[in-house]
């Protein structure tokens, strides 16, 4: 009996340690009122993204839910309007696997929204599922799509400075090892998926690092945020069906709820005084050191150039006229590199009308062009 009690006590003690070190998340403070500000949150129809959007809506922000599924995105926007009491929550279609969809979203957003104060890259995948593409789907969704979207929306972020870009990464970046000779090769099998996921999270951290360098002095700051171990759809979605009922109770005990996972991204989006820490990696609402591979500035620059090519950005744009304003290409052009053709981008929910010319002033004295993508 004594041994049984001792074992129970040890288990309880171990759980308390796990709870306070992993499960319990610090609460985000930051700016109290966000009235008059606009925030885009990708992948905001569930999990961490939805909880992030809810907190932003409660603080009065105009929140754009950028999601792939129209049905789930519109349902989430309705739920958030009801729960927050804020009618300024809308849905816009965005499929990060499709470069054409990213361009369409940017065009629709820039033509309808006069402000962009915070861009939160929350959407991501951990597995290719049953999809078999001719490119690295994990890198496309988790890094290349967000990279392109950031470039297309940077002029609006700059015009609304001080503004922020938050990239939701992961501690999995520590396992990442980028192979630039095979950066966009297809991913096959669960072992390749594990590596590709870690590589994409490393790419997130390197992107934040290089973006901070590119944006220095513009008033736009950026941060990589690790939400912690979270009991979200990203964790459960790709598990075998028979395993989910077994792991759900365990996940509830040892993983954070999505609300807890939203705290560090919210901290990076809202906390005042962290501007000098632009480009850094945050976990549990404070700066944390990254792996040696994530501190490699040469790798960050090389990834930047490689991603521009993968995103369809003109390789010679550095030599273009710096006074010429960038414009997204016609989003109706099909993409040979994309997943299935994106649906037409629409806005669901209350929206502003935007009169006058769009502010597309150049960010870094370099013109960004988007190539026409060839018809398959």
From Swiss-Prot:
Active-site positions on this chain: 197
Bias-annotated ranges (Low complexity): 333-342
Record-listed E.C. numbers: 1.1.-.-
CDD domains in the cross-refs: retinol-DH_like_SDR_c_like (cd05327)
Residues binding substrate: 170
Keyword Hydrolase part of the UniProt annotation: no
Compositional bias (Polar residues): 343-367
Residues annotated for NAD(+) binding in this entry: 46, 48, 197, 201, 232
Region (Disordered): 311-376
Function: Putative oxidoreductase.
Protein name, per record: Dehydrogenase/reductase SDR family member 13
Organism: Mus musculus
Organism lineage string: Eukaryota, Metazoa, Chordata, Craniata, Vertebrata
Gene behind the chain: Dhrs13
């Amino acid at each position: 009996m004594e041994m049984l009690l001792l074992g129970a006590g040890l288990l309880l003690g171990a759980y308390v340690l796990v709870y306070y070190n992993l499960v319990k998340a610090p609460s985000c403070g930051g700016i109290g009122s966000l009235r008059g500000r606009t925030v885009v949150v990708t992948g905001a129809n569930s999990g961490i993204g939805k909880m992030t959007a809810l907190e932003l809506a409660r603080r009065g922000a105009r929140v754009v839910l950028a999601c792939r599924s129209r049905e789930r995105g519109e349902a989430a926007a309705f739920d958030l309007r009801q729960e927050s009491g804020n009618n300024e929550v809308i849905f816009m279609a965005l499929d990060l696997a499709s470069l054409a969809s990213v361009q369409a979203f940017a065009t629709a957003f820039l033509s309808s929204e006069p402000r962009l104060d915070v861009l939160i890259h929350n959407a991501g995948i951990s597995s290719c599922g049953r999809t078999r593409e001719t490119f690295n789907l994990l890198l496309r969704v988790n890094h290349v799509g967000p990279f392109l979207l950031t470039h297309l929306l940077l002029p609006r972020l700059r015009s609304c400075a001080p503004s922020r870009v938050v990239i939701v990464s992961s501690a999995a970046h520590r396992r990442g090892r980028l192979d630039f000779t095979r950066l966009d090769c297809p991913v096959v099998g669960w072992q390749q998926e594990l590596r590709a996921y870690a590589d994409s999270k490393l790419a997130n951290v390197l992107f934040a690092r290089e973006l901070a360098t590119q944006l220095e002095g513009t008033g736009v700051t950026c941060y990589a945020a690790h939400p912690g171990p979270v009991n979200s759809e990203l964790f459960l979605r790709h598990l075998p069906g028979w395993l989910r009922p077994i792991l759900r109770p365990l996940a509830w005990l040892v993983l954070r709820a999505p609300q807890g996972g939203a705290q560090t991204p919210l901290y990076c989006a809202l906390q005042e005084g962290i501007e000098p820490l632009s480009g850094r990696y945050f976990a549990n609402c404070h700066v944390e050191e990254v792996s040696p591979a994530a501190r490699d500035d040469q790798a960050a620059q090389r990834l930047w150039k490689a991603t521009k090519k993968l995103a369809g950005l003109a390789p010679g744009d550095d030599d273009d006229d710096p006074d010429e304003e960038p414009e997204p290409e016609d989003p109706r052009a099909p993409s040979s590199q994309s997943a299935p053709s994106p649906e037409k981008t629409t806005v669901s929910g209350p929206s502003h009308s935007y009169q006058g010319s769009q502010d597309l002033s150049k960010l870094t004295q370099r013109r960004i062009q988007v190539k026409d993508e060839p018809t398959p």
